[in-house]
C-alpha cells in the first residue's frame, strides 16, 4: 500500500507559502512529491518525483523507473514530460523535481535537453527532503542550449 509522508508534504506547503509561490506552483510541487511515492528504483534506491505544468494549465506527474540494464532507466522528469506530450502537450511552463535527498536534486543532462525541447523559458522548482524549495530556470541550467529554434533559423 502507498504510504504518503504527510509531514513532508506539510513542510513543503509551508515553505512554498513563505516563498510566495503561486497556487499552481504549490499544486505542482505537491504533485511531484506524490509522484515520488511511485518510484521504481530497486537498484539505486534513489527515488525521484517530478511534475510538469503545461502552458494550458494541466499537470502531469512522473517518477523515475529503473531497469536492470540501467540504460533503459527513465528519469522522473522525462516520465512526466512524455506523459504530457502523449496527451497533447506541446509546451511546458514549469517543472517541479523532488527526491529523498537533503540536497536539491537537479535534472541530468538528458532531462535538461528534453525540458528545453518543450520550452526555453521553463521555471524549475527543486524541492529537498525538508520541503525547502529552490527556483531555477532551464536557461540557467542549460545555457547556450541547442534547441529546435537553432534548426529552424
State each model region's role.
Residues 24, 28-31, 35, 92-153:
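C-terminal binding/interaction regions
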Residues 41-44:
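Short loop/turn motifs at secondary-structure junctions and domain boundaries
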Residues 47-53:
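Short beta-strand scaffold segments in enzyme catalytic cores
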Residues 64-78:
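Compact, glycine-rich, soluble single-domain proteins
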Residues 75-96:
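Short, solvent-exposed cationic patches
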Amino acid at each position: 500500500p502507498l504510504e504518503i509522508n504527510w509531514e513532508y508534504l506539510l513542510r513543503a506547503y509551508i515553505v512554498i507559502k513563505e516563498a510566495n509561490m503561486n497556487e499552481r506552483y504549490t499544486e505542482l510541487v505537491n504533485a511531484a512529491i506524490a509522484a515520488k511515492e511511485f518510484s521504481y528504483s530497486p537498484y539505486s534506491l534513489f527515488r525521484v518525483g517530478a511534475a510538469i505544468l503545461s502552458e494550458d494549465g494541466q499537470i502531469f506527474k512522473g517518477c523515475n523507473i529503473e531497469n536492470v540494464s540501467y540504460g533503459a532507466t527513465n528519469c522522473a522528469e522525462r516520465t512526466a514530460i512524455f506523459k504530457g506530450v502523449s496527451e497533447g502537450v506541446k509546451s511546458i511552463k514549469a517543472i517541479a523535481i523532488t527526491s529523498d535527498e537533503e540536497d536539491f536534486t537537479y535534472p541530468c543532462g538528458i532531462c535538461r535537453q528534453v525540458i528545453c525541447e518543450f520550452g526555453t523559458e521553463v521555471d524549475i522548482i527543486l524541492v529537498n527532503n525538508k520541503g525547502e524549495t529552490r527556483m531555477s530556470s532551464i536557461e540557467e541550467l542549460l545555457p547556450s542550449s541547442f534547441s529546435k529554434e537553432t534548426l529552424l533559423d
